[in-house]
From Swiss-Prot:
Its EC number is 3.1.11.6. This is Exodeoxyribonuclease 7 large subunit. One of its GO terms (cellular component) is exodeoxyribonuclease VII complex. It comes from Thiobacillus denitrificans (strain ATCC 25259 / T1). InterPro entries: Exonuc_VII_L (IPR003753), Exonuc_VII_lsu_C (IPR020579), OB-fold_nuc-bd_dom (IPR025824). Its main location: cytoplasm. It comes from the Bacteria. It catalyses: Exonucleolytic cleavage in either 5'- to 3'- or 3'- to 5'-direction to yield nucleoside 5'-phosphates. The keyword Nuclease applies. Belongs to the XseA family. Heterooligomer composed of large and small subunits.
Length: 451
């Protein structure tokens, strides 16, 4: 029997869930409906388990929530939170089935406000990049052997000690000028920019290091100041940035001519090793000596050549006398040759004057030339007239009525022989003669249809 069809029977009871089933359903519902999201709050009850997992609570003025950040995630965190820290976590809402507790599974953690700072950083970076402030084509090479280094940092900063230690190890005695400035805190960005501009105005050094040690994002924020980036880009002195650690990037790094991961690395990039400098000096000295020796040898060879070319005055006089004698001989020969040519010309003129034969020969040549030109002109005229006659014959052939009839046309004439040009001249009953290319026919008009 089907109880569902019996209206008198009560409906079946709903299924009964176990606690485990309920918690599992609740966890799945939470995880499917709520995505990864950012949550802000104050850290409390922080505990690092022996497994490496972090357990803590996030709270605000009216509520709190349990959180867990497993070891596989927290090993990438930039800091370890402590009770009282104000943080932001990116987490997935879930339910801990064993105790039925609502919790957040943290994927990443950052100090509160870091997201807003990063957004401001990205916006300012895009703006300055659009202006060409970070254009790689504008980056300048560092001098290979600087005579003086400038350092923009705090006198109390560990970065200054790191720079001086590295320079003392690599290049003892290299002059260093400090341009002191606060490197964090309110107004630090403007003071750093002022120190960079002062170094450029004073023009005391060849390379400028802008540096500070590592720290939180807020500690390094002064080096993301727009004024600092613009001062570095406008500096007449090449700038090396060494801010924070290798993973830290600031706008100062993008604006600088060269970015170093740490202050120590900045000092190393800006200074040569003393031994390398000595080896370079020795190499240049050796090249200079070799060049000097080659130049000296070339000069000696030239002196020998010039000495061999020197001639005793008596020998020079004999050479001049010989040259004069040769010129006199050439002049005498030229005069005799000119006299001979003139005598020959006079004889030819006399012969032409006394004999008419030459005149007759010239006239005969002229007549022969004119005859040849007349023959060529007659031949050209004959050819031209032949072409003209051919064109006229072709035109006459096209106009010949027989040729027109041969293309399918016919000539209609009245009985009196008049050619019919217009249907309006015809009347019904008129007799017509129609001529074809071959033969003719007689016809009579039944009706005329003039246009």
């Amino acid at each position: 029997m089907d109880w569902s069809e019996d209206p008198g029977m009560p409906p079946p009871a709903p299924p009964v869930l176990s606690v485990s089933e309920l918690n599992r359903m609740a966890r799945r519902a939470l995880e499917s409906q709520l995505p990864l999201l950012w949550v802000e709050g104050e850290v409390s009850n922080f505990m690092r388990a022996a497994s490496g997992h972090w357990y803590f609570s996030l709270k605000d003025a009216t509520a709190q929530v349990r959180c867990v950040m497993f070891r596989g995630r927290n090993q990438f965190a930039e800091f370890t939170p402590a009770n009282g820290d104000h943080v932001e976590i990116r987490a997935l809402p879930s339910l801990y089935e064993a105790r039925g507790e609502f919790q957040l599974g943290a994927e990443s953690i950052r100090r509160a406000g870091a997201g807003r700072l990063y957004e401001a950083f990205v916006r300012l970076k895009a703006k300055l990049e659009g202006e060409g402030l970070f254009d790689p084509a504008k980056k300048r090479a560092l001098p290979r052997f600087p005579r003086c280094l400038g350092v923009v940092t705090s006198p109390q900063a560990a970065a200054l000690r790191d720079v001086l230690t590295a320079l003392g190890r690599r290049m003892p005695g290299l002059p260093v000028i400090l341009y002191p400035t606060p490197v964090q805190g309110s107004g630090a960005g403007a003071q750093i920019a002022a120190a960079i501009r002062a170094a450029g105005t004073r023009a005391e050094c060849d390379v400028l290091l802008v540096c500070r040690g590592g720290g939180a994002l807020e500690d390094l924020w002064a080096f993301n100041d727009e004024a600092v980036a613009r001062a570095i880009a406008a500096s007449p002195i090449p700038v090396v940035s060494g801010v924070g650690h290798e993973t830290d990037f600031t706008l100062a790094d993008f604006a600088a001519d060269l970015r170093a991961p740490t202050p120590t690395a900045a000092a190393e990039l800006a200074s040569p090793v003393a031994e390398e400098m000595l080896r370079a000096l020795e190499r240049h000295a050796r090249l200079l000596r070799q060049h000097h020796a080659r130049r000296q040898q070339a000069d000696m060879q030239r002196l020998d050549y010039l000495a061999r070319r020197l001639i005793h005055p008596a020998q020079q006089l004999r050479r001049r006398q010989l040259g004069i004698a040769q010129l006199a001989q050439r002049l005498h020969g030229a005069v005799r040759a000119r006299l001979t040519r003139e005598q020959l010309r006079i004889a030819q003129l006399g012969e032409r004057r006394t004999s008419p034969r030459h005149a007759l020969q010239r006239q005969q040549q002229v007549l022969e030339s004119l005859g040849a030109r007349a023959a060529r002109a007659a031949e050209s005229a004959r050819i031209g007239r032949g072409l003209t006659l051919a064109r006229l014959a072709s035109s006459l052939a096209h106009l010949n009525p027989d040729n027109v009839l041969a293309r399918g046309y016919s000539i209609v004439q009245q009985e009196n022989g008049a050619v019919v040009h217009d249907a309006a001249t015809l009347r019904a009953g008129d007799g017509l003669e129609i001529r074809f290319h071959r033969g003719a026919a007689h016809a009579r008009v039944e009706s005329a249809q003039p246009e």
